[in-house]
């Protein structure tokens, strides 16, 4: 294990214990510890990566799928420290179900913050509203930013260099702050960790019908959209939009969704357009 991050983890744990593990205090504790001894000036990244590849004595590695990749460099029952490598330019707009602080170890990023206003819950895992940009800043190597859990801290990062690497000191999970929504601008929030296996299989089967040239593909999609609830209907349209456009069947299919859901359909149209554009 890397000695620098062991020391960082012990300092954070000691200070957090001194305030009885207050979740509200944790972002500030993590930020102060990162700024006292900035990893950007203390850690030699090439040496750390080579040591990680050779040394078997490492903290437990999660299967979070976050980062490209993620390295866990300190683990505690209440929090952990991760290094996140980023090879792609951008992250999705998202909120967190954890709190802490992150520090730019290498590279630089454009950090954008958002608010989600006029929220209309559709299900526990799907919301409608208005996503609004509230600020943008350039994060250069050495910058540290606090993370608060929940909808009060919605953000995205556009990484300007490859790789960009961030150090994250974070809790495992903050009770009552989920789901950890991802935002599809300008109007939809979805829970990316909610798994509806039946819908997933149906969308995969629709892909088969599309790729094999099924003549009734659009008719089948319209029948589904006419009977499904808003959430599953939206995901069906999202999955099939390009294929329907290529077949000249999109407008008729959209009309089925719009007729079924009335005024609420207005949230879906610009969001689906944005998904295609991106």
Residue ranges and their predicted role:
Residues 67-87:
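A short glycine-rich, His/Asp/Glu-containing loop-to-beta-strand
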Residues 81-95, 148-150:
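Conserved short histidine dyad/triad with adjacent acidic residue
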Residues 92-93, 111-112, 135-138, 147, ...:
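Short beta-strand His + acidic residue motifs that chelate non-heme Fe in jelly-roll/DSBH
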Residues 98-117:
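Glycine- and acidic-residue-biased ligand/ion/polar-headgroup-sensing regions
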Residues 101-103, 155-156, 161-177:
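A short hydrophobic beta-strand segment most commonly corresponding to one strand
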Residues 103, 116-149:
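Short acidic-glycine-tyrosine-enriched beta hairpin
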Residues 167, 171-219:
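Charged, amphipathic alpha-helical linkers/stalks
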Residues 209-278:
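Intrinsically disordered terminal extensions flanking catalytic oxygenase cores
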């Amino acid at each position: 294990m890397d000695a620098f991050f062991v020391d960082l983890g012990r300092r954070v744990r000691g200070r957090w214990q001194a305030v009885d593990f207050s979740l509200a205090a944790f972002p500030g504790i993590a930020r102060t510890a990162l700024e006292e001894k900035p990893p950007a000036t203390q850690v030699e990244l090439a040496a750390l990566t080579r040591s990680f590849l050779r040394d078997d004595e490492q903290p437990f590695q999660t299967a979070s799928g976050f980062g490209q990749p993620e390295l866990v460099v300190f683990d505690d029952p209440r929090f952990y420290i991760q290094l996140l490598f980023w090879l792609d330019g951008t992250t999705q707009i998202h909120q967190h179900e954890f709190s802490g602080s992150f520090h730019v170890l290498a590279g630089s990023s454009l950090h954008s913050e958002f608010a989600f206003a006029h929220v209309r819950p559709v299900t526990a895992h799907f919301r409608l509203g208005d996503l609004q940009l509230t600020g943008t800043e350039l994060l250069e190597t050495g910058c540290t930013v606090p993370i608060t859990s929940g909808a009060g801290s919605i953000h995205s990062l556009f990484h300007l260099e490859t790789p960009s690497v961030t150090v994250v000191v974070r809790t495992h999970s903050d009770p009552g702050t989920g789901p950890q929504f991802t935002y599809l601008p300008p109007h939809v929030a979805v829970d990316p960790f909610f798994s509806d296996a039946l819908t997933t299989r149906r969308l995969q089967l629709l892909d088969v019908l599309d790729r094999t040239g099924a003549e009734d593909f659009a008719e089948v999609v319209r029948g589904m959209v006419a009977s499904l609830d808003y959430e599953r209907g939206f995901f069906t349209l999202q999955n099939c939009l390009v294929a329907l456009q290529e077949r000249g069947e999109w407008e008729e299919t959209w009309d089925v969704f719009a007729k079924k859901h009335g005024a609420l359909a207005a949230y879906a149209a610009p969001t689906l357009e944005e998904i295609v554009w991106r």
